[in-house]
Amino acid sequence: MRRALIILLVVVSPVFAQVRKLHTRDFTRLSQVQVGEALKQTDVIFIPVGAVETNGIQPSNRDYTWPLAYAKLMAEETGGLYMPGLMWSYPGTTSLAPSSIYSTPQAGTAFLKELAHSLLRQGFRRQVYISASHGPAPLTVGTLVREFFEETRVPILYINMDTYLPRLQLTAEQRSRTIYGAHSIAGHIEDLPLRGDYGAKESEPAGAIPANDGLTALGRLGFSGSLTLGSWVPDVMSHGGDRDLPATSAERAAWAKLGEEQLRAIIKKMRMPEAMDALRKHDRYTQELIVPKFFTKKP
């Protein structure tokens, strides 16, 4: 009788295996056991891409923190995971500044491609890369998704929030405090300065900046931008500054609360669960119809 009971317990115990519930959707903070369990439910993962560059008196990693917050909220909305991605992508016009980390678009693409191949091997087939408030990002991430598809025949997705957000037709008020919400979600709210943290002299360019009439004219004609023309900022303080600052830490916290609400509303409007289902269907169509028709060898 005792032997039969032991055998029964051995057979039944795997059914009642105890696994800690997800305490976060950050892939890097989960255990091997948790990741394995998560992969039984989803193959979706979100990866932010940004830059560390001068933003005047604002944090130099601002344009990474924004997509990081989007990635976290998208993971929550879809039941997927998210993870740190590429913080050091090509900065573009700000590369001359002491706080700007320079890396070529090709180096960024190569790094992300290694990451994408690893994630695919691990079981994350639906990968979503996100950038926000960073004009040169498509040079890195757009190349990634196309080259990765040609190499693996697996479609991964790039969401450029700068070009996507206009589709939602948001008012300025509906996105007025998202930068504060993003830093709060990322746990970096104290990085955003308060009014009076910097003096007037330290908040402005070192002196008068002569007008670049040629660049101004090209912009007016529609022939400028990070993807179309080489240029640098004329002063390290002339990029990304914000004079609308909270007066107190309490006001900053209130702006952060509002910003989080705005970001969550944006994610709802994006209909990410529907998008992830569509990505799965597109992948299946590719594998079942297009690949057999045009390829005889595995990638």
Where do the model's predicted regions map?
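Positively charged n-region of N-terminal signal peptides that target proteins for export
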Residues: 1-4
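Hydrophobic h-region of N-terminal signal peptides that target proteins for export
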Residues: 8-17
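Extended, histidine- and acidic-residue-enriched regions that form the cofactor-binding/catalytic faces
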Residues: 18-80, 84-92, 98-102, 110-128, ...
